[in-house]
UniProtKB/Swiss-Prot annotation:
It comes from Cupriavidus taiwanensis (strain DSM 17343 / BCRC 17206 / CCUG 44338 / CIP 107171 / LMG 19424 / R1) (Ralstonia taiwanensis (strain LMG 19424)). The keyword tRNA-binding applies. It comes from the Bacteria. The gene is dtd. Its main location: cytoplasm. This is D-aminoacyl-tRNA deacylase. A motif (Gly-cisPro motif, important for rejection of L-amino acids) lies at residues 142-143. It catalyses: glycyl-tRNA(Ala) + H2O = tRNA(Ala) + glycine + H(+); a D-aminoacyl-tRNA + H2O = a tRNA + a D-alpha-amino acid + H(+). One of its GO terms (cellular component) is cytoplasm. Keywords: Cytoplasm, Hydrolase, RNA-binding, tRNA-binding. GO terms for molecular function: D-tyrosyl-tRNA(Tyr) deacylase activity; Gly-tRNA(Ala) deacylase activity; Ser(Gly)-tRNA(Ala) hydrolase activity; tRNA binding. Homodimer. One of its GO terms (biological process) is D-amino acid catabolic process. It is found in: Cytoplasm.
């Protein structure tokens, strides 16, 4: 399972002109399930993402996770958006292949599991809409962007 995480000052996702999720400072996570992924990969990826230290401490060092973004125990927002194109195979030709991505059914199941687990573990979770054409806007803070991956079993 893959997550492209970005530290943001704010982010929003809309579907057909309707806002489905919006956060202030926090993390925007573009999430993708790969063939062979299970709930175990989703849970490991979420645990890594929530504890990944990408926010600056009082000394300006990247040392704080989204769960304690300000160093005083206050969490930042988490906006989770499905994006199957993260699993694209771009090694040959000029058209990406999406064979490495999970099937739509498995992708939806794992995305929904990821979101449910995120909501159980983090107080500020917003989402996009699985399978929809979405418009994602963000103000990247840094910019700070990381690619996290837990390989399929």
């Amino acid at each position: 399972m893959i997550a492209l995480i970005q530290r943001v000052a704010q982010a929003r996702v809309t579907v057909a002109g309707r806002t489905t999720g919006e956060i202030g400072a926090g993390l925007l996570a573009l999430v993708c399930a790969e063939r062979g992924d299970t709930e175990a990969q989703a849970e490991r990826l979420l645990a890594k993402m929530l504890s990944y230290r990408v926010f600056s401490d009082a000394d300006g060092k990247m040392n704080l996770p989204v769960q304690n973004m300000d160093g005083n125990g206050n969490p930042g927002g988490l906006l989770v958006v499905s994006q199957f194109t993260l699993a694209a195979d771009t090694n040959s030709g000029t058209r990406p292949s999406f064979t490495p991505a999970a099937s739509p059914e498995d992708g939806r199941r794992l995305y929904e599991h990821f979101v449910a687990q995120a909501r159980a573990a983090h107080p500020q979770v917003q989402t996009g809409e699985f399978g929809a054409m979405m418009q994602v806007s963000l103000v990247n803070d840094g910019p700070v962007t990381f690619w996290l991956r837990v390989p399929p079993a």
